[in-house]
Amino acid sequence: MFLRHCITFTMIALLAGCAGFGSREALQGHGDPQQWRAHKAQLSSLDGWQINGKVGIRAPRDSGSGTLFWLQRQDYYDIRLAGPLGRGAARLTGRPGGVVLEVANQGRYEATSPEALLEEQLGWQLPVSHLVWWVRGLPAPDSKSKLTLDGDSRLASLDQDGWQVQYLSYTEQNGYWLPERLKLHGKDLDVTLVVKDWQPRQLGH
């Protein structure tokens, strides 16, 4: 179960680098579209961050929770899980073209992309490159999305590629309003993420 849990979250949490925005959004809710566009443009400038928090996973046959560390530096990522979810530790590092998953006392797994690693290890297909956007409170730009804005013109929820993401609370860090608690619901999988510490950065291109 440990390997399944670790790969499940880390693959969802993976990313394929930061791309540009599309115009494939359907907006609804109480927010102002112009304020949303300004908010989205500000968050798109973030190409680096460090996150510390907790993650919970619920699947039909098993569930678990643990701590999360996520370091993002443009297209490089270092994602680590520890605690009851892992009964040890797991670390995922990579950039486009190469991904390495290391699981304590179980082994090392490599692939050319997070999607390929997930398919190889579990036989599952998930939009694994989307969370780099979702964790910032943004829709992924490469597919259609349905967005519900809250009264502050931030995301209250989004539907994209068969996944539903709920934004339960936000926190302000260095002038950025960033998700603090979010829930992801997909087919046979629920993920809850609670960010305890956000350190957003603009690294430049």
Curated annotation (Swiss-Prot):
Disulfide linkage: none
Coiled-coil stretches noted in the UniProt entry, renumbered to this chain: none
Spans traversing the lipid bilayer: none
One Gene Ontology term from the biological process aspect of the record: lipoprotein localization to outer membrane
N-palmitoyl cysteine lipid attachment residues: C18
UniProt cross-references to InterPro entries, sorted A to Z: LolA/LolB/LppX, OM_lipoprot_LolB
UniProt keyword annotations, A-Z: Cell outer membrane, Chaperone, Lipoprotein, Membrane, Palmitate, Protein transport, Signal, Transport
Mode of membrane association: Lipid-anchor
Cellular component GO terms held in the UniProt record: cell outer membrane
Keyword Signal part of the UniProt annotation: yes
Keyword Signal (UniProt): yes
Family matches, as Pfam families: LolB
Superkingdom, natural source: Bacteria
Signal peptide: 1-17
Lipid-modified residues, S-diacylglycerol cysteine kind: C18
Compartment(s): Cell outer membrane
Complex formation: Monomer.
Similarity remark: Belongs to the LolB family.
Task of the protein: Plays a critical role in the incorporation of lipoproteins in the outer membrane after they are released by the LolA protein.
NCBIfam families, per database record: lolB
The protein's name in its UniProt record: Outer-membrane lipoprotein LolB
Source species: Pseudomonas putida (strain ATCC 700007 / DSM 6899 / JCM 31910 / BCRC 17059 / LMG 24140 / F1)
Gene: lolB
